[in-house]
Amino acid sequence: MQTQDKVLILHGWGGSDAPHWQAELASEIAKNYGTVSFPLLDNCHFPSKNRWIKQVKQILEEFKPDTIVCHSLANTLWFWLCHEEGMQTIERLFMVSPPSLLTEEKTIKTFFPCALPQNIYAKEVQMFVSNTDPWVKMEEAKRVAKHYDIPLTIIQDAGHINADSGYGKWDLIEQLVLDKS
């Protein structure tokens, strides 16, 4: 990451406040003089796809990120945004724990089902899932990665890769986003 890069971190259902790895990542970017936006999306515990799309489109327009880091439902949100007109291509997209495109959960039902967009609007994409994620089966995660011809990292026994599964500070994502070797 160059100090002029702008990183947008998008949380999933319920937010990603500390000690979640996304909160830790936002802090690390700021400590390294990076430019980061880590907004709390509207009504995060009872999200609406249309409200989130509207909010994030405005953030994209105003902040103009180079890198976007999505966790969970934010990946589905990104897919919906990619169906919208006028999307600009970003440099890097990190997709962590995307849920099934056919998720059946009453509280987030406006997001599903979701079709894969033709264009993912990112020059470089990396996807991370866990073999024990309750929100997606490995076969589906592999199909999504293959569809976009993107690298898929499968982390063993990491649940939904969130604070509840032990992912507060996550060195790997920090190294990748900050381009540390």
Task: Name every feature range the model reports, one short phrase each.
Residues P47-S48, A158-K169:
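Catalytic histidine-centered segment of alpha/beta-hydrolase-like enzymes
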Residues A26, N131-P151:
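Conserved loop-alpha-helix segment in the C-terminal half of the alpha/beta-hydrolase fold
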Residues Q2-K64:
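Active-site catalytic motif of lipid deacylating hydrolases and related acyltransferases
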Residues G12, L40-C44, L93-T103:
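Active-site nucleophile loop of the alpha/beta-hydrolase fold
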